[in-house]
Amino acid sequence: FPTVHRNLALAYYNVKKQPQRAYEEMEKAFALDETDARVYLELDQLKKRMNIPVSERLEDMEKHFTLVESRDDLYLEYVTLLNTLGESEKALNLIKARKFHQWEGGEGKVAAQYLTALYQLAKAAAAEGEYVEAKTILLQAVDEYPQNLGEGKLESAQENNLYYLLGLAQEKLGETEEAFASLTKACHGESEPVGMMYYNDQPPEMIYYQGLAY
């Protein structure tokens, strides 16, 4: 009865505060039915809470990739792990290859990984002196989102990091006016850190890029 072990896992974690016992029960639940993508997602989320190394989680997901492909939230978690480990080109290709459908609690998450992948690729290109490539990638990042992401860009989107790096690339290319415009955009936003209550609130780290842009 895999569901019994899954429910026991939730009780051990949420009520008894025994994460290791919860992990053991969730592993049993999945072992009894390795076709249950939801239980696999919950197992991975438990691994995240228990600080299981990202590389281990990624390796396990690759062993169960059919399950990963069956759910948008699992697929996006896999992409997130790739971005975390610096495999941004692979992450971006996987994002482009899938048609996402928004789910409750998932607002903004697909776009966030899309932008993370592009930013990291642009940063790597700039570090190698490939400023034209970096600029091309960043112009893609600040443009409208591809339709397959399942969500559009909000007017309040905070892209200070993107515009800051774009401004630097344009500056290196001798595009003075364009660089000034980009760095000016990088200065926009709240100047004091506040707690993020909603997915579209300004991330505190954007203030750092505002400071750099000034």
Show which residues each predicted segment covers:
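Specific register positions within alpha-helical solenoid repeats of the TPR/Sel1-like families, i.e.
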Residues: 13-14, 47-49, 83, 119, ...
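Structural signature of tandem alpha-helical TPR/SEL1-like repeats
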Residues: 15-28, 50-63, 87-93, 133, ...
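Conserved structural position within tetratricopeptide repeats
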Residues: 27-31, 63-66, 100, 143, ...
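Short coil turns that delineate tetratricopeptide repeat
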Residues: 34, 69-70, 103, 146, ...
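Residue-level recognition of tetratricopeptide repeat
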Residues: 10-11, 45, 80, 123, ...
